[in-house]
């Protein structure tokens, strides 16, 4: 079974081909250094997992990545995508939801981000994010690429049997993530 962890960063998953675009990791199971906005050297893929990767591509590069993913997957293969939920972020910002904003600031930004706007913009720009994804946009693009059974899930809720292994408890990720699964 060919399982890919695309845009893995430091999240190396045993049993997966872990693909990132940074220095290799000595402790990796299998680690490839590939610019996924340009290359997609895989075929006959059973599982694609990408956690907080798609937002690091421009809109057009993200669409191309989704198309290439679809073409590389076997019929019946599954893809799970986690991205910051732009709609959720906009709502929390407009509602001045300090509990949400402070939880993110404490997990990822630090005390230099005291205001609602600084936290919101810190999420958008401080981590190399190039695109914001909401459910409607991601669902539309996945459908356009040919994916089926597109559904919104929760963190740690998946058709993947090993989801507790893939997504260990992480309050920051759980707080802000739009989780989507789809099939070829």
For the regions a protein language model found, what residue spans apply to each?
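S-adenosyl-L-methionine-dependent methyltransferase catalytic module, highlighting the catalytic core
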Residues: 59-64, 68-74, 78-183
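Short amphipathic alpha-helical surface micro-motifs
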Residues: 1-2, 11-14, 114, 160-163
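Conserved SAM-binding loop
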Residues: 3-91, 180-184
């Amino acid at each position: 079974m060919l399982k890919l962890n695309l845009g893995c960063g430091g999240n190396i998953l045993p049993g997966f081909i872990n693909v990132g675009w940074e220095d290799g990791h000595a402790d990796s199971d299998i680690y490839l250094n590939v610019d996924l906005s340009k290359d997609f050297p895989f075929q006959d893929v059973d599982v694609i997992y990408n956690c907080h990767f798609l937002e690091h591509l421009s809109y057009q590069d993200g669409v191309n990545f989704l198309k290439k993913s679809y073409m590389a997957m076997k019929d019946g293969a599954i893809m799970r995508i986690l991205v910051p939920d732009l709609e959720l972020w906009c709502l929390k910002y407009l509602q001045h939801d300090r509990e949400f904003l402070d939880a993110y600031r404490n997990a990822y930004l630090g005390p230099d981000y005291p205001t609602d706007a600084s936290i919101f913009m810190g999420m958008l720009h401080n981590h190399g994010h190039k695109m914001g994804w909401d459910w409607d946009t991601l669902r539309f693009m996945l459908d356009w690429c040919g994916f089926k059974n597109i559904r919104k899930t929760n963190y740690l809720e998946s058709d993947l049997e090993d989801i507790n292994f893939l997504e260990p408890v992480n309050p920051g990720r759980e707080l802000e993530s739009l989780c989507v699964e789809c099939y070829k």
